[in-house]
Amino acid sequence: LPLCKGYCMAINPLWRKTASQWVRQIDLWGRKHNFVAIRLSDIFFDFQSVYGDVNLAIELRNQVAKMIAANHFYLSAMFSEIADHNVALGFFGGFITDDEEQEFKGQINLKHTGTLPMVEAIRLLSLREAITEAATLSRIEALHLKGILDETERETLAAAFELLTGILLDKQISDFKEGKHVGYHVDPETLSGRQQKRLTEALKIIDDLRKRVKSEFTADIF
């Protein structure tokens, strides 16, 4: 497995702390409100326990969830950092493809303009509600149980996430088998007409979610 390009690994002292040290670190990031602090805490919020005393992770997540939910200025700053992370859907409903790099011309970066905008929006709503779930689908379910998402929203958002991750995973598996670079770009022309329609609908659902989050965190409806 390739090492994390951002050096977000246990061999980096920044990401190797005791529970009490993590609480102090999150408190510091929460008071700074700058780009680096928000980006690092954004990564931290999705942590999951994989080894050792699971209760340590549970207690830490509960404590951090309460800290962030009470920090409205920080939540607003978090939204500001992700405000321009839009989906790959144009004003008239067509796909917005990557035309900057010749290698990916006509393709969609399904992570940066698909799953990422959704993950960020769901994470932000979950942090505001002090939800301790880390996985996106689990967060959607928790938001539904709290009454933040209705039944239709729960179903459509979960379906949209599963569709995007499914398309992306299929492409990555195919590229790996063919010895190609495994990345996040997908050519919509390689999808069936039905898949293209479903992808368009999924991106529209995510775009609507982001508009809602923008309205709730900035009171701006445009």
Label the model's feature ranges.
Residues 1-222:
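A nucleotide- and high-energy phosphate-metabolite-utilizing enzyme signature
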